[in-house]
Amino acid sequence: MRLCGVASAFLSTLILIAHIDASTNLNVSVTDVQNISLPGDQIGNFTQSVSGPPSGDEERTSANSAIRKVDLFVEKLITFQVALRAKINRFLAKLKLAWWRLRNVDPNVTFNKLNLHEADNDILSLDNFHTWVKLVESYNLQHPAEQVSILSKLQEQFGEFEVSIMLEQAKNGADKYTEDIALELQHEQISRWRDDNLSLTALYKALQFGKSEPSLLTGPALRVWNIYTSNIESAETSLFDYLYQTIEDAHLSSLLIAAKQSPETVELATKIQNQLRQKWLEILVPPNLVFQHYKLDTNPTHLLDRPETKLWVRYQKMYWGKTKKEVTLKEMIEDFYKADEIAIIIKSATTDYGKHLAKKLPQCDSKHFKTFHNLTILPLLFVFHYTIGAEDDLSSEKNLISQYNHVPTSCETANCVAGGCLFENCASPLLCRGGLCYFRKCKDATCEGGACIFDNTAEASCPGGGCQFVNVPVTLADGYCDGGGCTLDGDDHPSSLAGSLAE
């Protein structure tokens, strides 16, 4: 302490001299600086040499040189002081450690004496924790019947599953000793879980997978799960099943997209993504919802280059294989993007796959353009309908139907693309893409671009054409008319043609 006091006084004197020298006409030489002495508690005299009246430049040069030398000396002294303090601290720590070992102090006591009871989640990297680990090892050697568990002490302070996350994070630390401790403790914890038959359900809840946090599938919780499941033989539900039951489809899809960006989790994320797609196919999730789940409806830039677009195209093909309902990428883009955004989608394609898809989109129209198209074709539909049907409301239904039979059609005909098509009593789904179609007593029919009349067709929908609903107990609010220009018959339906067009 006496030495530190002398050193502090010495430093203060040097700095004071430097400032005095810089603000006066004194000329300090190298010899003068070297003559600084420290006899006991007294600071040696600082001899100054005064020559004749110096010039301004000489005065500034001499002052700056003296200040630089004093600064250099001060820096060296501070460095020495820091190094000396570190050595003293290490010596005292070793002395304290030896004293505790000699007295066989209980590690639970030394844990608090080292202030580890106040430590945060980074406790595993602290020097005091490393010291305590050595104390525990020494204590356990001398007291085989009174073993102290490092893992139990950590779990007591932080919680069992919180410690599992801490250990996994510490395994990737910069300090080798910390990594070794974390690896050993993790092995002990996994063994305990296995011996206690910890269920995957309990582990899933404890690791809080269901929080839907963005980093969920790229963080340490997933790695802990994988380590435990690789150490047990279990026929329990897979990770995907837990994720699917606790996380909304759109959120889960986003998590998987993020997880695929990490080399550590890309393989698992791809596997779960495939499982999710199979689940969607089982329950026949509509392609437009999958399009949104993949976040393909929000940003037109590089849309065709994204791996999620390829996933959607693959899903659409599988969906068609199960339902025979074709929904194209062109239709999805038209539904979710305006004309100027579609231009961005086409121009921003850079990959070979994206450019290949872009070639199929030059004729894309936005939904706004399709609405205009529907408004144009709808009057033609009604003129056509009432002209060919009869001169008045008493015309027979047979005459009306016969006028539509311009081309050979049957229930096996999936699409009507031109002419007038008649479908009657059909159980299979049918599409009208460009013709004038009449659906009567059919189970399911869709009018995507033509002009259609639905008569007693229970599951009719009009996403793009000009449509009239006859004897169909629905309203526009039921989703039957979700993009086309539509009218509903009679007083049973409050929605009118004018109302639907205004909407």
From Swiss-Prot:
One of its GO terms (cellular component) is extracellular region. Glycans are attached at residues 27, 35, 45, 108, 197, 374. A motif (dEER) lies at residues 57-60. Residues 1-22 form the signal peptide. Induction: Expression is up-regulated in spores. It is found in: Secreted; Host Golgi apparatus. Keywords: Glycoprotein, Host Golgi apparatus, Secreted, Signal, Virulence. Secreted effector that suppresses pattern-triggered immunity (PTI) in plant host. Belongs to the RxLR effector family. Has the canonical dEER motif, but lacks translocation RxLR motif, which characterizes most oomycete effectors identified so far. This is Secreted RxLR effector protein RXLR-C08. It comes from Plasmopara halstedii (Downy mildew of sunflower). The gene is RXLR-C08.
